[in-house]
């Protein structure tokens, strides 16, 4: 594992603040939004569709504390862009929005460095000016959007069905306590991680924050490489993974195959009380990965000589299958859902940080084994050729 202290030159102007929202393109926005509300603890926030004058696209916006997800679907059969996207990639992330200061300057510098500006929009809603500028990621499935003081230009009045959903169901379910987006992870095909990281460095003036390679993260069968990109203030972190050659197809390669290329693998949602959050999510029916049963026995032995003390009960963490990673300064707790749709692509992470800014590298091997068990169930833990290239089914 490598940590980087060099942030590069501080940008003259413009500042990335935090994740603003994540937009998914899905086959049925109403059903997807309802699923994330009933399962993950979101609540309806805004809507646009035929009733609000939107004739081409319907969007349902849901919110939990400072986390905002937008689910969008085509309304008409001739929407080729959204239709082709769904056929190739399935339901998944189309856009990641960052809230920024001085959007005009950031866009100007990105354009000078070669970024493709998809479109520029100025939105006025509730007397707040919003500047919405999507950036095209070369050869990527998803776009990045810069948002300055943005409020959604959607009908903020909940639809009758949304009000009914909250009154009859959501208000009776346990609260999950998920607060903010901690980080968002992208997967790339082999040998494309470096070009993706260079895009962030060149166009957005991000820097390398942390990295691991396949000599550090591997099992008997598969491996990965990963680099984390961050803005100057390090309030936004974007890990980028790529598969490394192994005896069998890695879970990163499985993702790339089913997603039809690069894309967002998972979204990490931060909480201050992961035990309550996971109890609530399990009560709501969310399924999580389970690491090998030996994990917690080994963890207890390691913690005996550790410089830090985990405040939470290890027995409770084992009961809920929550993982622990630590260093001499602090620790984090994390757990991963199974895929949120039928394709084994996008999933969620729930994370609690206690003076620890890592990404669970100490858990990667155990997680890889858990992923491999799921791959085996799907029939996707398949052999590779002598060069580590997966055989196609």
From Swiss-Prot:
Q: Which InterPro entries does its entry note?
A: 4OHPhenylPyrv_dOase (IPR005956), 4OHPhenylPyrv_dOase_C (IPR041735), 4OHPhenylPyrv_dOase_N (IPR041736), Glyas_Bleomycin-R_OHBP_Dase (IPR029068), Glyas_Fos-R_dOase_dom (IPR004360), VOC (IPR037523)
The Gene Ontology CC terms held by the record are: endoplasmic reticulum membrane; Golgi membrane
Q: Enumerate the cofactors the protein uses.
A: Fe cation
Does this entry carry the keyword Endoplasmic reticulum?
Answer: yes
Q: Where in the cell is it found?
A: Cytoplasm; Endoplasmic reticulum membrane; Golgi apparatus membrane
Q: Give the EC number.
A: 1.13.11.27
Q: Which reaction does it catalyse?
A: 3-(4-hydroxyphenyl)pyruvate + O2 = homogentisate + CO2
Record keyword Phosphoprotein present: yes
Q: Where does Fe cation bind?
A: 183, 266, 349
- What are the recorded GO MF terms, alphabetically? 4-hydroxyphenylpyruvate dioxygenase activity; metal ion binding; protein homodimerization activity
**How is this protein positioned relative to the membrane?**
Peripheral membrane protein
In which tissues has expression of this protein been reported? Liver.
User: Keywords, A to Z?
Assistant: Acetylation, Cytoplasm, Dioxygenase, Endoplasmic reticulum, Golgi apparatus, Iron, Membrane, Metal-binding, Oxidoreductase, Phenylalanine catabolism, Phosphoprotein, Repeat, Tyrosine catabolism
A Pfam family cross-referenced in the UniProt record is Glyoxalase
Modified positions (Phosphoserine) are 211, 226, 250
Cofactor details (free text) = Binds 1 Fe cation per subunit.
Domain named VOC: which ranges? 18-152, 180-338
Pathway listed for it? Amino-acid degradation; L-phenylalanine degradation; acetoacetate and fumarate from L-phenylalanine: step 3/6
Chief location of this protein within or outside the cell: cytoplasm
Q: Please give the superkingdom of this protein's source.
A: Eukaryota
Summarizing the function annotation, the protein's role is:
Catalyzes the conversion of 4-hydroxyphenylpyruvic acid to homogentisic acid, one of the steps in tyrosine catabolism.
Among PANTHER family, the record links this protein to: 4-HYDROXYPHENYLPYRUVATE DIOXYGENASE
Q: Which family, according to the similarity comment?
A: Belongs to the 4HPPD family.
* Subunit (UniProt): Homodimer.
From the Swiss-Prot or TrEMBL record, give the protein name: 4-hydroxyphenylpyruvate dioxygenase
**Source taxonomy:** Eukaryota, Metazoa, Chordata, Craniata, Vertebrata
Gene encoding this chain?
HPD
